Amino acid sequence: MENIYLTLALSPLIGSLIVGLAGNRLGRTLSHTITILGVAVSTVLALYVFNHHVLEGGDVFNENLYTWMQIGSLNISVGFLVDNLTSVMLVIVSFVSLMVHIYTIGYMVDDDGYTKFFSYISLFTFAMFMLVMSNNFMQLFFGWEAVGLVSYLLIGFWHGKESAVEANLKAFLVNRVGDFGFLLGIALLLAF
């Protein structure tokens, strides 16, 4: 199952990186096909995970994939926690993201930033998966920050419009307030 969870989480990231780095050379059709394929793979796997955990009553998966950093007795690792709630959220996130990707084909048809936008929304999907599947507070925080960063990029995508710039600044400031509370909570949990 570990490979299924990894593939589910990494498929949108791979699509985002390919399109982000080579989208203009690939062209619009291939760019949106790559990102949609990555999210579609995640959606199919999310349905499989949902079936395994919720419908068949599979065991909770809580494993560290690797230790990222060790500071004294504090281990900062990357891992996944997949239970019934996570399985439901994976289906919701992947399905909604797939629908957004498909809708974006028509919505962005005349926009010069077509491939960049697809790269961003695919990256957003990966960030949401990392947030939903995290098995520790540090990874949860990094997932939260990644969602905030990509939200910032998407909200300010049309940076030539004054309203987009204002909304972007507002989202950035609101996220920083949330970050402070989040970090304070993590610090209190680690202290006690």
Residue ranges and their predicted role:
Residues 1-192:
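...captures the hydrophobic TM-helix bundle architecture rather than a specific catalytic motif
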